[in-house]
């Protein structure tokens, strides 16, 4: 392990590199500032259900399909992780996706960080990442289950 003297600068540099090199260059994104604002918004609002039409309207994308693509790019570069709601109905599983942040340092150490103080949300994020780390290699699926204000996770084997 090595010690980073300026953790905020390091994390911000990593974030900028993911946006510019891993996403903009790879996917030929023209509106980089919109992507950056979306990425910051998704990190600040981790653990919330994703509504692509709202994102498209908020960031001025031409369609919800564009917002969905941009969020997909953030997941493909491992900045965000997606999770679906547990339901026996496939339509509900697909429709109600949430996102979490791969590394909680992005929540607290970015220059535009807004949501670093809510310890409950950070613990929920850490719990999901750890469940995924432990169960994905075993081909288990992890879902979220919401009952009023409580968020629980469900781990399922196979289908």
Say what each PLM segment does:
Residues 2-158:
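Accessory nucleic acid-recognition modules appended to NTPase machines
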């Amino acid at each position: 392990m090595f010690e980073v003297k300026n953790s905020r600068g390091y994390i911000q540099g990593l974030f900028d590199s993911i946006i510019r090199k891993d996403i903009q260059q790879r996917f030929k994104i023209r509106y980089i500032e919109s992507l950056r604002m979306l990425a910051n918004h998704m990190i600040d609002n981790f653990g919330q259900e994703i509504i692509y039409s709202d994102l498209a309207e908020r960031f001025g994308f031409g369609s919800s399909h564009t917002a969905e693509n941009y969020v997909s790019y953030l997941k493909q570069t491992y900045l965000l992780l997606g999770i679906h709601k547990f339901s026996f109905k496939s339509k509900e599983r697909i429709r109600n996706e949430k996102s979490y942040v791969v590394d909680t340092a992005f929540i607290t150490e970015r220059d535009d960080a807004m949501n670093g103080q809510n310890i409950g949300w950070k613990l929920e994020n850490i719990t999901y990442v750890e469940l995924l780390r432990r169960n994905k290699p075993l081909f288990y699926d992890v879902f979220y289950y919401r009952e009023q204000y409580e968020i629980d996770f469900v781990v399922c084997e196979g289908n």
